[in-house]
């Protein structure tokens, strides 16, 4: 089996990280907003580093360079992300650290924070502890994620997350208690025959009207134009 997940402009080694490259990560990386003024970004739970790499590609034409830090609690994941970063065209703007968010003290604020967070709460555990820690919210619950993200955000910064649709309302309620308010919600369905199961939700520190969208990935087995708009610059070929 090929150990590399190949994109158009970079490849991701996918062997040591606790969680592998998946649809959720690519969706977040391609769908999330990236502020045009973004000079510092933080990827929480970076895994293989794929979301940070997508963000690096999306910001390569920014007037000011956007430096992206990926952190992960799992040492093998952080090491693999660092290797993937080093082999990418944007190695000078990417770094990985093995550190829990709760202990991360960078001495700076970030214009953009993004995460594909663990959201399984006390559900069936994987037999491998590393995978279980990456998938379950015990080691990084939403309150910790929101409170630490809020403290690390620059005044005009944004937080982008991908989560199951059924927990969006609860997350919005929790976020408000930390002074974070949603400005964009993208509900995502895999096909036009299914209900949305994932959502990209984005927060800022300002109360604004919520922009709600729906994204359908495929129709009759073919990528929809709106999905292609997001992923064409990244995937090698359509599936």
Predicted regions and their residues:
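SAM-dependent Rossmann-like transferase core, predominantly class I methyltransferases
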Residues: 2-40, 46-58, 202, 216
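A generic structural signal for alpha->beta connector loops
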Residues: 9, 65, 91-93, 156, ...
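Conserved SAM/SAH cofactor-binding pocket of Class I
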Residues: 30-115, 121-127
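Conserved Class I SAM-dependent methyltransferase catalytic core
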Residues: 17, 21, 139-196
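General small-molecule cofactor/ligand-binding pocket signal
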Residues: 13, 69, 95-97, 183-186
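Residue-level signal for inorganic ion chemistry
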Residues: 28, 116, 145, 203
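SAM/dcSAM-binding transferase cores
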Residues: 195-239
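Mobile active-site "lid"/loop adjacent to the S-adenosyl-L-methionine
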Residues: 117-144
């Amino acid at each position: 089996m090929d150990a590399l997940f190949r994109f158009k402009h970079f490849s991701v080694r996918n062997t040591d990280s606790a969680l592998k490259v998946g649809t959720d990560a690519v969706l977040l990386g391609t769908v999330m907003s990236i502020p045009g003024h973004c000079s510092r970004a933080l990827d929480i739970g970076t895994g293989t580093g794929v979301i940070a790499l997508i963000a690096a590609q999306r910001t390569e034409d920014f007037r000011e360079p956007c430096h992206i830090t990926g952190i992960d609690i799992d040492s093998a994941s952080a090491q693999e992300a660092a290797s993937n970063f080093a082999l990418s065209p944007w190695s000078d703007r990417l770094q990985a650290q093995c550190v829990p968010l709760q202990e991360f003290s960078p001495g700076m604020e970030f214009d953009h924070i993004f995460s594909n967070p663990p959201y399984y709460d006390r559900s069936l555990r994987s037999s491998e502890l590393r995978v279980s820690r990456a998938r379950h919210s015990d080691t990084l619950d939403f309150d910790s994620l929101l409170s630490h993200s809020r403290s690390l955000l620059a005044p005009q910064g944004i937080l982008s997350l991908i989560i199951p649709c059924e927990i969006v309302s609860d997350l919005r309620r929790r976020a408000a208690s930390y002074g974070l308010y949603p400005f964009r919600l993208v509900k995502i369905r895999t096909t036009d025959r299914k209900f949305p199961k994932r959502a990209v939700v984005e927060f800022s520190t300002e109360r604004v009207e919520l922009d709600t969208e729906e994204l359908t990935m495929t129709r009759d087995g073919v990528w929809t134009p709106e999905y292609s708009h997001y992923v064409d610059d990244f995937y090698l070929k359509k599936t």
